[in-house]
Amino acid sequence: MRPDPDCRLCDLHRGRTNIVLPDGNPSHGIVFVGEGPGEFEDLEGRPFVGRSGKILDGMMKEAGFDRTKVMITNTVKCRPPNNRDPMPEEMAACRPFLESELYDARLVVGLGKSDCRDLMGYDGPMSEIVNIPMTIRIRDREIVFIPTYHPAATIYNKDSRAALQETMRVVAEWLK
């Protein structure tokens, strides 16, 4: 299921250039979920192509894999204004698209707080749940979910960088 190119399910459509669709390869059953597209993602129509994407790509490479082995998507498909976190009603509008992207996954990696709130209902500190495997329910399926920091958090926080590197090592093991 893909959003209509003229989607107007929430107010985010007003500021978008492009709907940002998933990127990568779903055949391995591993999906990274980010919060929302940024400026460069909105311009290109692909997730994680800006500064955070370069960090993510570098960490995947360090762990021995790349985008051709995973799928990358976001909780919302249009850029929130001023790069703010997506609002609950915006995530709810995109939820059917996200569920269809996650349905066949074996492992979902949540990159940041917004997707943890959306997929797990968790609104506490990320530090309490990072890299603790959990289970989420997508329709009638239970899927392993690993919450971790958004790549942007690693710019200013060494602890989040180490945690995200550990996440990538776990994903590399799942790919074996």
Question: For each predicted feature, which ranges?
Answer:
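Short acidic-hydrophobic sequence patches enriched in Asp/Glu that either
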Residues: 48-55, 90, 163
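Short, conserved active-site loops that position catalytic residues or coordinate cofactors/metal ions
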Residues: 35, 74-75
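Short, flexible, glycine/charge-rich loop motifs used to bind or transfer phosphoryl groups or to couple energy/partner
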Residues: 19-23, 60-61, 98-100, 134-136
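The first long alpha-helix at the start of the GST-like C-terminal all-alpha domain
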Residues: 51-70
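Active-site and ligand/interface coordination hotspots across diverse enzymes
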Residues: 1-51, 61-62, 141, 176
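Glycine/proline-rich loop-helix segments at beta-alpha junctions forming the active-site rim
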Residues: 67-68, 75-176
